[in-house]
């Protein structure tokens, strides 16, 4: 996999050999993606981000510059992180308010916006359709 689609001026990207990067992904300069992480298609990750181990991002996700996503986090479709956002270990984003295994509901994705400089603590759950304000701090 590891077919990173990036502008030619993005040279200092580190992607661990166990990470999977799908097609149509943009990864900014200075970003690091660690062990067993998966970035799905049509996702953009800004410059100087640190993506921990066992992280899933996408599809169709936008992550700003300088973000840190700790281990075991899933950033699902509908989530946007502005610059300098911190996502603590094992925190959770939801993207469908009323999920059901037997009923397909991807047409009901509710967007979540995390604004500049926000911090989300370990094991916190962010319900979809939420906007987290600039520099807010969410505890578990």
Predicted regions and their residues:
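Flexible, glycine/small-residue-enriched loop-and-beta-strand segment within the central core
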Residues: 2-6, 10-11, 17, 23-27, ...
């Amino acid at each position: 996999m590891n077919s990173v689609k990036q502008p030619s001026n993005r040279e200092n990207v580190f992607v661990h050999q166990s990470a999977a990067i799908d097609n149509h992904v943009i990864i900014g300069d200075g970003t690091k993606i660690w062990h067993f992480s998966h970035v799905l298609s049509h996702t953009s990750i800004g410059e100087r981000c640190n993506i921990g181990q066992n992280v899933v991002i996408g599809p169709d996700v936008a992550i700003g510059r300088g973000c840190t996503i700790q281990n075991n986090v899933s950033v699902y479709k509908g989530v946007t992180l502005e610059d300098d956002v911190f996502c603590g270990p094992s925190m959770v984003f939801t993207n469908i308010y009323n999920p059901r295994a037997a009923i397909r509901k991807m047409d009901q994705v509710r967007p979540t916006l995390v604004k500049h400089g926000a911090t989300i603590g370990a094991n916190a759950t962010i319900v979809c359709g939420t906007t987290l304000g600039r520099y807010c701090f969410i505890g578990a």
